[in-house]
Amino acid sequence: MMNEDNKKVPKRISQTILNSLKGGVVPRIGLPYITVGRKNEIEALLHDVDIIAEGGASFRFIVGRYGSGKSFLIQTIRNYVMDKGFIVADADLSPERRLQGTRGQGLATYRELIGNLSTKTKPEGGALTLVLDRWINSVQTQAVQETGLEPGNPMLTKAVDQRIYAVTSAVSELVHGLEFARVLSLYYHAYVDGEDEMKMKVVRWFRGEYGTKREAKEALGVNIIITDDDWYEYLKLFAAFFRMAGYAGMMV
């Protein structure tokens, strides 16, 4: 529920809410303006959020009849946790998108989740590139503040490289972390060198869009791709990386 002194809904948000409700779907933004009677459920789920923010994990089933408000509650929590600095990923399961499969169904779920990555500043999905760029910018800013060096100074570049390496080294200790860290490093160097084409190749790999190892090898020099067998491990790698990048956690 909104505070008494903050009732006015911005026009862009109000239009999004109305269009979604007309179409019979839950709005992805602006839900606090129309949420009522969910205090107990929200508090229970936000307790889980606090656990995640402290480095723990949580898993919930929300069960109810058709039309009872399950999707509405999930989207409400989605908005709450983004305001708390979390990254959120969501996907609807279907015969083509499953938690497990041998014909691309698991990978399809992963692709949907990564494609729908959302943050407070990009709540409607597609936030992966934004998150990666923000991470690099924050590392550069931190290095400037701590060293007092001016941008362009070779010593500053070295200091940034060391901080980037610290993150990639920590990630590399996890399952498939070595490959993940290598691709993360490729993105960083492409960002610094202004190589937009290489950045997009890296993003394609993170999204699980390379169909063969040969294709990934030719594009990035890595001999591994994300598949049905290991996509969940990469989801865990992203969760660990997001924490290191300064976010409160990841909620799927």
Predicted features, each with a name:
Residues 1-58, 156-157:
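A short, basic N-terminal segment
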Residues 25, 29, 42, 61-62, ...:
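General secondary-structure edge motif
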Residues 54-76:
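Walker A/P-loop nucleotide-binding motif
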Residues 68, 72, 76-249:
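P-loop NTPase nucleotide-binding core
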